[in-house]
From Swiss-Prot:
Gene3D superfamilies according to UniProt: 3.10.450.50, 3.30.70.330
Sequence ranges of Gly residues compositional bias: 430-447
SMART domains for the chain: RRM (SM00360)
Regulation: Under physiological conditions, G3BP1 adopts a compact state that is stabilized by intramolecular interactions between the RG-rich and the acidic regions that inhibit phase separation. Upon stress, polysomes disassemble and mRNAs are released in an unfolded protein-free state.
Domain writeup: Can mediate both protein-protein and protein-RNA interactions via the NTF2 domain and RNA-binding domain RRM; protein-protein and protein-RNA interactions are essential for undergoing liquid-liquid phase separation (LLPS).
Taxonomic lineage of the native organism: Eukaryota, Metazoa, Chordata, Craniata, Vertebrata
Protein name according to UniProt: Ras GTPase-activating protein-binding protein 1
Region (Disordered): 144-172, 184-243, 255-329, 413-466
Length: 466
């Protein structure tokens, strides 16, 4: 069999899936993605109010990660770009939303430079990691502009899951609520990008434990939060102490019961990250038709289309989900109870935000007011009070006349459960009746050539876990 080299896009997306899964499940292990010369930046300001500086080296990165107090961290990935870079490395850019400790989702952008580890082919570690929240860069806070955007942020997995995107070995490994299926959907069509001539990095740190699986070498995944650094020799001093730590704790043993017996997961420094890249994804279109029964592809395609056909107009929504429309103003990223909010429709197109706020201030203290002027008239918006009493007061005084002549369409904001119920009803009433489940289990790798599966992580730890 011919073993193909995984494309940068495939490497990047597999790394992203593994990285953010670990961020949710075991953030204290994230430092294993990095090496002695890795750099890491995770937004925020220092004590002087200036952008925080990068930290270098596995130990300092571990301290920095622990200082972030990542707890129950959930990530919605909206887009992943990956390109080949110098010395057979891969640069990965991630855009999405992140919620830490059950707080509101915040839009972020993160860039990784994955460098070859050196001891095994297709094994990488994170050489540079740069993370920024967009609200810190552009000022103010960005909230989900309206109900529709909340739906998209919270239910991405409802839209994209297809049988071919994630094979059994990876599908059983991570929680789709942690990493949005947007990323998985793109995995069906990775584009192999030309990689520059290899310029070997002699100083990469060898990891003996990773060499145990030579047929499918492991990509050394390097990390999630932020890093800025150019060339990096391999981390060597920490390797010995880390290997001892790795022998005492193995994620592979924890997750092995969930993995299919046919796909062995390499035992690396960061076994939890080492998940196989689906062999089907690099070039699904290149498989010879002669190897596939003549009628089955069409049937499978129809099934896939039915499963993916969750209203087509929802596809582009994630783009505007966090207030990306030019007319939507930046707003504070605070999640208020639905009982404190009102939907305001039929707003005059020239209405001023301060004028509207003063109008509703007569009913109670207005803590936030949003106007959506995306081009469709009349405009609409939301008013947020500090208590539910003003909301009921406004509703009981309907009809509400603005400027004495404009009747506003004032409604209580629907709860999330009500919105979800409406969506389910709409789907059940759609063409063809209720949809069948997506079930059937994930399909395994297709017939044809195989692709070497990347692995991530240097497998270096600090002291044994406490």
């Amino acid at each position: 069999m011919v073993m193909e080299k995984p494309s940068p896009l495939l490497v990047g997306r597999e790394f992203v899936r593994q990285y953010y899964t670990l961020l949710n499940q075991a953030p204290d292990m994230l430092h294993r993605f990095y090496g002695k010369n890795s750099s890491y930046v995770h937004g925020g300001l220092d004590s002087n109010g200036k952008p925080a500086d990068a930290v270098y080296g596995q130990k300092e990165i571990h301290r920095k990660v622990m200082s972030q107090n990542f707890t129950n961290c959930h990530t919605k990935i909206r887009h992943v770009d990956a390109h080949a870079t110098l010395n057979d490395g891969v640069v990965v850019q991630v855009m999405g939303l992140l919620s830490n400790n059950n707080q509101a989702l915040r839009r972020f952008m993160q860039t990784f430079v994955l460098a070859p580890e050196g001891s095994v082919a297709n094994k990488f570690y994170v050489h540079n990691d740069i993370f920024r929240y967009q609200d810190e860069v552009f000022g103010g806070f960005v909230t989900e502009p309206q109900e529709e955007s909340e739906e998209e942020v919270e239910e991405p997995e409802e839209r994209q899951q297809t049988p071919e995107v994630v094979p059994d070995d990876s599908g059983t490994f991570y929680d789709q609520a942690v990493v949005s299926n947007d990323m998985e959907e793109h995995l069906e069509e990775p584009v192999a990008e030309p990689e520059p001539d290899p310029e070997p990095e002699p100083e990469q740190e060898p990891v003996s434990e990773i060499q145990e699986e030579k047929p499918e070498p492991v990509l050394e995944e390097t990390a999630p939060e932020d890093a800025q650094k150019s060339s990096s020799p391999a981390p060597a001093d920490i390797a010995q102490t880390v290997q001892e730590d790795l022998r005492t704790f193995s994620w592979a043993s924890v997750t092995s019961k969930n993995l299919p017996p046919s796909g062995a997961v390499p035992v690396t420094g960061i076994p939890p990250h080492v998940v196989k890249v689906p062999a089907s994804q690099p070039r699904p279109e290149s498989k010879p038709e002669s190897q596939i029964p003549p009628q089955r592809p069409q049937r499978d395609q129809r099934v896939r289309e039915q499963r993916i056909n969750i209203p087509p107009q929802r596809g582009p929504r994630p783009i505007r989900e966090a207030g990306e429309q030019g007319d939507i103003e930046p707003r504070r990223m605070v999640r208020h109870p639905d009982s404190h909010q009102l939907f305001i429709g039929n707003l005059p197109h020239e209405v001023d935000k301060s004028e509207l706020k003063d109008f509703f201030q007569s009913y109670g203290n207005v803590v936030e007011l949003r106007i959506n002027s995306g081009g469709k008239l009349p405009n609409f918006g939301f008013v947020v009070f500090d208590d539910s009493e003003p909301v009921q007061k406004v509703l009981s005084n309907r009809p509400i006349m603005f400027r004495g002549e404009v009747r506003l369409n004032v409604e209580e904001k629907k709860t999330r459960a009500a919105r979800e119920g409406d969506r389910r009803d709409n789907r059940l009433r759609g063409p063809g009746g209720p949809r069948g489940g997506l079930g059937g289990g994930m399909r395994g790798p297709p017939r044809g050539g195989m692709v070497q599966k990347p692995g991530f992580g240097v497998g270096r730890g600090l002291a044994p876990r406490q």
